[in-house]
Amino acid sequence: GHTRGAVFGDALASLLSYSGFEVTREYYINDGGAQVDVLARSIFLRYQEAFGRKVVFVDGTYPGDYLIPIAIGLKEKVGDSYLNKSEDEWLPELRDYAVDAMMDLIRSDLDLLGIKMDTFFSEKSLYGSGQIEAALGRLRDNGLIYKGVLEPPKGKKTDDWEPREQTLFKSTEHG
């Protein structure tokens, strides 16, 4: 997924730059949400496999073979020290390891494509900074967001969809 966006973004940035606009090529590192936990757990499964254990990739994990060398690297780095630890003990370290390993792959892909980023921005750096809360406060004060429930997805049956209240942006009123 990141490659397609990088190619499109780089082409667009090049066109804008050629047209005289000042352009900053920024890569947004999606390292702050639950998907990083899923990635770390998936690497942990591959790590267990590296020790000959049989594992099952349940729904919500990533079974991709691209995780095998990452797990082997983890095995070389920490040995068997995670095998008998609880998830609470290994997950925080493995989250960081997973993000670093994926960013190494992404940077390698970008280099192969000849795409140079000016900056890399970590989503995680926003947490605890107060910036998210401040932005939501400004949007709320200006009447641009509200609490509501989305309609069910159209065009396909979803057995797992449940209505839930969430913060929504008033996009229909603002273009």
What kind of feature is each model-predicted range?
Residues 1-175:
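NTP-dependent nucleotidyl-transfer catalytic core
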